[in-house]
């Protein structure tokens, strides 16, 4: 699969986004965004650079120590970028820089300045403006620059609601990239099913997944991978990934690639030895039933809450049927008795961040719209010390897919990974 050539958005899309921001800004105002900086790992080594998602959304610029200023007056709307100047010596050591001279043409902005000039240039640009869209304390290095520039405004506004709502509805180009992120993530999970066997270590399976991501132009995961064998699956964010996989256990894998800045996010649970035991099958089928029903309900015009309420009812009834919960289903739901086995939400927005931005509405009652992308990930987690029948102790199951809201309902972007028991067992024993 050759995907590298497809891994970019056209620069006109970033310009169009900025135009939409200008339309929402107050007259005589400016909006200020800062990039990420390189993060120190230890001594003189840094982590691989990953751009701030908001900054990327409006610029498509992947260098640290930069700032974007959107200026709106009665006469003009300008996009101004501050960035590192060219430096032949540092570029020889650490990589190429775009530089001030090339930035306007490459980024489709009106003006460019060295970030070293920020404190002196900013007051001149912002003179006579009445409002500044700026969020302090996200990037403290940027706060320092703003402080040094000594600019004062009668009104400081938060740009996050505006940009978060924009990011929530994906463009056709974003959907194309997210489909590819889902496809590559699916390949990683399929590889994991094919290579898992008793006595391998969790980290070996993680390495198989990451290798598959890398083979398909996704160099980094979108979050820390979870490979949780046995009762480790009952730890929601288990990332140690250092235990052997035991014959007779399940393994829960929650892993996603990042492709062209966009996240994939899949969870699958399957038997280490390729064959579900009867108790494992019973819990798995209950989670799968809940997920399938949620997928039916997660369509434009409905809310996440509608789907989650149905998932809770299905799970509670199923847990009663298995003797794990005891009592009247309606009463158990009212008491939230299910929460000892299902303690997280049904899903989350997906995009530039794996837990992407955008309001869910009160009690997750926001109505889904075409262009939104959401995960659907019900689970059941029964700890080893739970007061339940012995055969269910230590079983943790989660099944997660990525859904795109469409005019026809939804599209599962991650459907390539098997989740029916027969399909999983056939793949693992092929």
Curated annotation (Swiss-Prot):
GO terms for molecular function: aminopeptidase activity; manganese ion binding; metalloaminopeptidase activity. Binds 2 manganese ions per subunit. It catalyses: Release of any N-terminal amino acid, including proline, that is linked to proline, even from a dipeptide or tripeptide. One of its GO terms (cellular component) is cytosol. It comes from the Bacteria. Mn(2+) 1 binds at residues 265, 348, 377, 400. Its cofactor is Mn(2+). PROSITE patterns: PROLINE_PEPTIDASE (PS00491). Its EC number is 3.4.11.9. Keywords: Aminopeptidase, Hydrolase, Manganese, Metal-binding, Metalloprotease, Protease. SUPFAM superfamilies: Creatinase/aminopeptidase, Creatinase/prolidase N-terminal domain. It is an enzyme of class 3 (hydrolase). Homotetramer. Belongs to the peptidase M24B family. NCBIfam families: PRK10879.1 (NF008131). This is Xaa-Pro aminopeptidase. The lineage of its organism: Bacteria, Pseudomonadati, Pseudomonadota, Gammaproteobacteria, Pasteurellales.
């Amino acid at each position: 699969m050759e995907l590298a050539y497809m891994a970019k958005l056209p620069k006109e899309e970033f310009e169009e986004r900025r135009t939409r921001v200008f339309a929402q800004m107050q007259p005589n105002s400016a909006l200020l965004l800062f990039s990420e900086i390189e993060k120190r790992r230890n001594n003189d080594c840094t982590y691989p650079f990953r751009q701030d998602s908001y900054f990327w959304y409006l610029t498509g610029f992947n260098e640290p120590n930069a700032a974007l200023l959107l200026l709106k007056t009665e006469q003009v709307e300008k996009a101004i970028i501050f960035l590192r100047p060219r430096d032949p010596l540092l570029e020889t050591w650490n990589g190429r820089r775009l530089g001030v001279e090339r930035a306007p043409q490459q980024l489709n902005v009106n003006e460019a300045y060295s970030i070293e000039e920020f404190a002196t240039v900013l007051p001149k640009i912002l003179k006579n403006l009445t409002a500044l869209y700026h969020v302090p304390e996200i990037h403290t290095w940027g706060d320092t620059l703003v402080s040094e520039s000594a600019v004062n405004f009668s009104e400081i506004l938060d740009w996050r609601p505006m940009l978060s709502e924009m990011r929530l509805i994906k463009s056709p180009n974003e959907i194309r990239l997210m489909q590819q992120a889902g496809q590559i993530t699916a390949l990683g999970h399929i590889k994991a099913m094919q290579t898992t066997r008793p006595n391998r270590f969790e980290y070996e399976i993680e390495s198989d997944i990451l290798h598959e991501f890398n083979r398909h132009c996704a160099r980094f995961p979108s979050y820390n991978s979870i490979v949780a064998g046995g009762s480790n699956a009952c730890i929601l964010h288990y990332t140690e990934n250092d235990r052997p996989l035991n014959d007779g256990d399940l393994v829960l894998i929650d892993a996603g690639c990042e492709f062209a800045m966009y996240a994939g996010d899949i969870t699958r649970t399957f038997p280490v030895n390729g064959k579900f035991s009867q108790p494992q099958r019973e819990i798995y089928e209950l989670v799968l039933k809940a997920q399938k029903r949620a997928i039916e309900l997660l369509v434009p015009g409905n809310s996440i809450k509608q789907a989650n309420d149905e998932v809770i009812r299905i799970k509670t009834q199923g847990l009663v049927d298995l003797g794990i919960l005891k009592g009247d289903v309606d009463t158990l739901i009212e008491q939230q008795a299910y929460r000892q086995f299902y303690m997280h939400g049904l899903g989350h927005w997906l995009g530039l961040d794996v837990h992407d931005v955008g309001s869910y509405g009160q009690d997750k009652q926001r109505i889904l719209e075409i262009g939104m992308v959401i995960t659907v990930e019900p689970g059941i987690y029964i700890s080893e010390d739970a007061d339940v029948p012995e055969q269910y102790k230590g079983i943790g199951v989660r099944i997660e897919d990525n859904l795109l809201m469409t005019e026809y309902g939804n599209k599962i972007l991650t459907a390539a990974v098997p989740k029916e028991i027969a399909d999983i067992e056939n793949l693992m024993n092929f």
